[in-house]
């Protein structure tokens, strides 16, 4: 029974009903029969009065209950606000936490004879805090096994470790020079300053190599993490692209020569050992630009991977292709270029240690390894060349690593690099002749391209016959010796003259550009004239436009150097005259001045 109404001095509904019934009974009992109608009327009136009082009491009770609920809600809200304010006051009065770095973890020990007390036996950690080294206790809520050296911890006002945090994410960048055991290392910082540092717990589980960049907290002397540097990432080994010898056109003899030199040692190592032969350490690919030197280098790496996987019976064996562009290695600081070269071969040896073949490809080799003593403004080659020589045939062996160099000025490379035993195989990548050009065209003009209906109808709807005819007519136009294809007239030092045609400066890159240009013409015809498909006329027009773009390219100031880069070797050239049929064909040629020596630079 709810007694809340008794607190207000009011009867409950049950009590009111009982009182009304008792009153009616007494009054009815007091009436002596015979009953009269007037007495009954009085009794009914009194009952109604009592009922009205009961309803009034019920309304008062409902109002009191509602007021009581509101009061309870207000009290609960006030209690929550009081608790919030109390917590805020406690937090404002709480002293700040401090940070420390773990130097050493001291688990609980059994007291030994002569020990100095609990400081040497209880669980504790040695930390750096505000430049001081201290031994502090650990809260029972903190698991000591989850802490590691170099890690940051949170300390309360009593300098008790109450929480373990992560590692500092900022610091000084240093270079690893030497490992000193498992937990220490010798590093080189700014101004070549060397110092011994400790390795953090997270860093002790990482495989570190000489030359790695580390983040150092100089306040505590801890190396915290390994940092990938941009200059190092540029030298990261790349997996070989999916390029095979079948993707290269017009270089059959050169590819066969390279396969004999590179693949035979992998296919028949027993025969090589029996005959006392060693695999070549390097290959030099030289020739004019755009003739496929880089493609061949990638195909060599792909082929080596396939042969190595076949020999090892492991189809998952990968090969790696490290593409190094000569100018990327040059650095204005003394010794940095040599360090980059050491890093390249260190990474190559690391990857090759598991049997994976690694190809180190130096593009534009003449820009980096020039003949010593030929520098005009510097002598950096006097230290760069010996560094490469020591890496190729030094004390450390290069197993499963082959060096491939590419250059269009092989006459500028230091002779010590070109001697047998270093770059053993030298392959000249010549400009394609008509047959080789047709082979290259066939790589780009394939039967899955859309061809014009008239061209297909001319050859009976045979797609392959249409492709063959397109290739044949385009090659004939490119290699024609008609007057319209005359390009240059060169005069040699002995007075002889020679007429050079566009075919003398053709390359695989030019062939690809001609096909791409023809495809763009086909797309433009489709958009403007609604005529879909590649036509022979597109290819012939592309040949003419491609040649005209090169009419101003010959360097008439230093024609001999320009001719050497373009692949024209032999007698020194003293005079060049452009013979292009067009706007530049009427311009007179220019002779060079021979009074000053400009060196090897153009």
Curated annotation (Swiss-Prot):
Q: Which Pfam families match?
A: AAA, Prot_ATP_ID_OB_C, Prot_ATP_ID_OB_N
Q: What's the encoding gene here?
A: arc
Species whose genome carries this gene: Paenarthrobacter aurescens (strain TC1)
Alphabetical list of PANTHER family matching this protein: AAA-FAMILY ATPASE, PROTEASOME-ASSOCIATED ATPASE
Molecular function terms in GO for this entry? Answer: ATP binding; ATP hydrolysis activity
Provide the residue span(s) of the region labelled Disordered.
1-40
Q: Coiled-coil annotation: which residues?
A: 35-91
Q: List the disulfide bonds.
A: none
Subunit field text: Homohexamer. Assembles into a hexameric ring structure that caps the 20S proteasome core. Strongly interacts with the prokaryotic ubiquitin-like protein Pup through a hydrophobic interface; the interacting region of ARC lies in its N-terminal coiled-coil domain. There is one Pup binding site per ARC hexamer ring. Upon ATP-binding, the C-terminus of ARC interacts with the alpha-rings of the proteasome core, possibly by binding to the intersubunit pockets.
Q: In which pathway does it act?
A: Protein degradation; proteasomal Pup-dependent pathway
Into which family does the record put it? Answer: Belongs to the AAA ATPase family.
Which PROSITE patterns does the entry mention?
A: AAA
**Where does the chain bind ATP?**
290-295
User: Would the keyword Nucleotide-binding turn up in this protein's UniProt record?
Assistant: yes
Example GO CC term: the record gives: proteasome complex
Domain comment as written in the entry: Consists of three main regions, an N-terminal coiled-coil domain that binds to protein Pup and functions as a docking station, an interdomain involved in ARC hexamerization, and a C-terminal ATPase domain of the AAA type.
Stretches for region Docks into pockets in the proteasome alpha-ring: 601-602
**InterPro entries named among the record's database cross-references:** AAA+_ATPase (IPR003593), AAA_ATPase_domain (IPR050168), ATPase_AAA_core (IPR003959), ATPase_AAA_CS (IPR003960), NA-bd_OB-fold (IPR012340), P-loop_NTPase (IPR027417), Prot_ATP_ID_OB_2nd (IPR032501), Prot_ATP_ID_OB_N (IPR041626)
Q: What UniProt keywords apply to this chain's record, in alphabetical order?
A: ATP-binding, Chaperone, Coiled coil, Nucleotide-binding, Proteasome
Q: What is this protein called?
A: Proteasome-associated ATPase
State its role.
Answer: ATPase which is responsible for recognizing, binding, unfolding and translocation of pupylated proteins into the bacterial 20S proteasome core particle. May be essential for opening the gate of the 20S proteasome via an interaction with its C-terminus, thereby allowing substrate entry and access to the site of proteolysis. Thus, the C-termini of the proteasomal ATPase may function like a 'key in a lock' to induce gate opening and therefore regulate proteolysis.
Q: One GO BP annotation here?
A: modification-dependent protein catabolic process
